């Protein structure tokens, strides 16, 4: 008997599972808020230099840019006796007395003057947040293995609530960045524990539905963020409103049961049995729960206990050629997806469209994108779907280079299309990666893939800074990287309708079988070629 069969005895899809998935899914609504929060809390408004204190305010104080608007980062050197208000030949200087902002919102950019020479600090703040997610993955993963999934989930909720609230009261930008880094670490803990506890307690036949439901909560969270940002123009209150609910989620998480596999592998058989009996009672199968014993639990999960004793590490991903290929191609696909996704998701204000409406559109495109991706995965296969999603996204991003800024509708349509393709790419990669890696290396493979996605999302804001050299440079980098990721996916094995590989030998045999079939097909085609006879 496997754990799935034990789960069937206590109720594999009853009231417990519905409540369990709901409690795991609700906090995901808030995860979207934190991931994309700087779209609204770090908006850069129209601005220009503040005139010197002893100058009379007027158009002549500021030089004009080629569009006839006040320069953002320069002003005329103030000469008290100057008599020519429109004299464009006068010397200019940086904004020594600060800036005047044309905005009804309060943002970190306005509060800490993150413009002109300091504008890189805005992108750095987002990169530091992403670095927190990157660092939090392995650190919290190790803590999760040591202390359990449930305590780490509860602690991560509490940590996100505290660090997010701390960011709302930050007295300076460095303090704000530290708290945002901790927010990123917390999100890693929440994501890791949510995935594991969802898979643990839901039957195989329902995992796709439950996982998709949780994924759609992230999409809904993007809608909620737009509404909150519109209603709350002060960045500190918006930050606090997005963080405070996690105090409540930390309390609700005490109801969520611990992973049975973790309890068994940790030798906590008595607690594992009590947890299963509690689930059985909740699902109306109390008598079935009473029949379970510790000895039965040990016997039926012996395979899990034995397999856990064999340790596989990162080096095993590079032991054989096919695994090296899979790891390289998947790493590039994950990196390019995270890299390009956040270039679009965090660039809402660049398209000259109302950011609240555009954020709703960016969130809404995920719904049809993920649905179409699921259909394509089921009928066209994983490899083709993954390749074309990244190739289409890369093409859309590169096309933005050739569309003038005045054509806002077309630029927005291309960005929305690209973002939808990248959302589908994420959905495809989660499934594809879990199917390509053998069971003994699946967790390690997913871990290294997640790292590359986070590296991409961390670097993306910094690459945007290259736009100061030439506006088209960031899109060239983002688009080309997506094309490379899509091309790499063509070299992966197709997993549609194939059983999951269990061991390294399984994937080697699978690769040999594919190679043999390909060679036989080429030989058959060659045998059908009729040589042309030359005249004598």
Curated annotation (Swiss-Prot):
Record GO biological process: glutathione transport; monoatomic ion transport; organic anion transport; prostaglandin transport; quaternary ammonium group transport; response to toxic substance
Known tissue expression: Expressed in the liver, brain, kidney, choroid plexus and weakly in the eye. Moderately expressed (at protein level) in the brain capillary endothelial cells (BCEC).
Chief localization: membrane
Catalytic reaction(s) noted: estrone 3-sulfate(out) + glutarate(in) = estrone 3-sulfate(in) + glutarate(out); estrone 3-sulfate(in) + 2-oxoglutarate(out) = estrone 3-sulfate(out) + 2-oxoglutarate(in); glutarate(in) + 2-oxoglutarate(out) = glutarate(out) + 2-oxoglutarate(in); urate(in) + 2-oxoglutarate(out) = urate(out) + 2-oxoglutarate(in)
Positions of the UniProt region annotated as Disordered: 515-536
Topological domains annotated Extracellular: 33-123, 180, 234-236, 349-354, 405-411, 493-536
Keyword Chloroplast: no
GO molecular function: antiporter activity; organic anion transmembrane transporter activity; prostaglandin transmembrane transporter activity; protein kinase C binding; quaternary ammonium group transmembrane transporter activity; solute:inorganic anion antiporter activity; xenobiotic transmembrane transporter activity
Intracellular or extracellular location(s): Basolateral cell membrane
GO terms for cellular component: apical plasma membrane; basolateral plasma membrane
Modified residues (Phosphoserine): 4
Side of membrane Cytoplasmic, spans: 1-11, 145-158, 202-212, 258-327, 376-383, 433-471
PROSITE patterns reported in the protein's UniProt record: MFS
SUPFAM superfamilies: MFS general substrate transporter (SSF103473)
Function: Functions as an organic anion/dicarboxylate exchanger that couples organic anion uptake indirectly to the sodium gradient. Transports organic anions such as estrone 3-sulfate (E1S) and urate in exchange for dicarboxylates such as glutarate or ketoglutarate (2-oxoglutarate). Plays an important role in the excretion of endogenous and exogenous organic anions, especially from the kidney and the brain. E1S transport is pH- and chloride-dependent and may also involve E1S/cGMP exchange.
PANTHER family cross-referenced by the UniProt entry: SOLUTE CARRIER FAMILY 22 MEMBER
Similarity section: Belongs to the major facilitator (TC 2.A.1) superfamily. Organic cation transporter (TC 2.A.1.19) family.
Name under which the protein is recorded: Organic anion transporter 3
């Amino acid at each position: 008997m496997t754990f799935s069969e034990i789960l069937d005895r206590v109720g594999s899809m009853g009231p417990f599972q519905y409540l369990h998935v709901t409690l795991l899914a609700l906090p995901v609504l808030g995860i979207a808020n934190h991931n994309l929060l700087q779209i609204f809390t770090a908006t850069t408004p129209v601005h220009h230099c503040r005139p010197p204190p002893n100058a009379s305010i007027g158009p002549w104080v500021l030089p004009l840019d080629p569009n006839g608007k006040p320069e953002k980062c320069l002003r005329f050197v103030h000469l008290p006796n100057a008599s020519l208000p429109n004299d464009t030949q006068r010397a200019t200087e940086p904004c020594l007395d600060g800036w005047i902002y044309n905005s009804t919102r309060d943002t970190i950019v306005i509060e800490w003057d993150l413009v002109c020479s300091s504008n890189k600090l805005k992108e750095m703040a987002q990169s530091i947040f992403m670095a927190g997610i990157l660092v939090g993955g392995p650190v919290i993963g190790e803590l999760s293995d040591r202390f359990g999934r449930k305590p780490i989930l509860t602690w991560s909720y509490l940590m996100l609530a505290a660090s997010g609230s701390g960011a709302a009261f930050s007295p300076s930008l460095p303090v704000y960045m530290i708290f945002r880094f901790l927010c990123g670490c917390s999100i890693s803990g929440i994501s890791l524990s949510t995935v594991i506890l969802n898979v643990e307690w839901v039957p195989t036949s329902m995992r796709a539905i439950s996982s998709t439901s949780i994924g759609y909560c992230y999409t809904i969270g993007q809608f909620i963020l737009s509404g909150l940002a519109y209603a709350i123009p002060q960045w500190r209150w918006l930050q606090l409103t997005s963080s405070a609910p996690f105090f409540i989620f930390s309390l609700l998480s005490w109801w969520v049961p611990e992973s049975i596999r973790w309890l068994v592998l940790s030798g906590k058989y008595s607690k594992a049995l009590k947890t299963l009996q509690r689930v059985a009672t909740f699902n109306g199968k109390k008598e079935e729960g009473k029949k379970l014993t510790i000895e039965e639990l040990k016997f039926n999960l012996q395979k899990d206990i034995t397999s856990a004793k064999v340790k596989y590490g990162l080096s095993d991903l590079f032991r054989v050629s096919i695994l090296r290929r899979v790891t390289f191609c998947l790493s590039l696909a994950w990196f390019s997806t995270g890299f390009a996704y956040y270039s679009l998701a965090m660039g809402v204000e660049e398209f000259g469209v109302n950011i609240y409406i555009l954020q709703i559109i960016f969130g809404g495109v995920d719904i049809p994108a993920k649905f179409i991706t699921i259909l394509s995965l089921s009928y066209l296969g994983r490899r083709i779907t993954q390749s074309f999603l990244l190739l289409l996204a890369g093409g859309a991003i590169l096309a933005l280079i050739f569309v003038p800024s005045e054509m806002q509708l077309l630029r927005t349509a291309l960005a929305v299309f690209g973002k939808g393709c990248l959302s589908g790419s994420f959905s495809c990669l989660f499934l594809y990666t879990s199917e390509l890696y053998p069971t003994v290396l699946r967790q390690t493979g997913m871990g290294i893939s997640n790292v590359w996605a986070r590296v991409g999302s961390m670097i993306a804001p910094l690459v945007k800074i290259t736009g100061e050299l030439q506006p088209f440079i960031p899109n060239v980098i983002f688009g080309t990287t997506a094309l490379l990721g899509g091309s790499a996916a063509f070299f992966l094995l197709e997993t549609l309708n194939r059983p999951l590989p269990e061991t390294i030998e399984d994937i080697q045999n699978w690769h040999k079988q594919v190679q043999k079939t390909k060679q036989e097909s080429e030989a058959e085609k060659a045998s059908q070629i009729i040589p042309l006879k030359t005249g004598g």
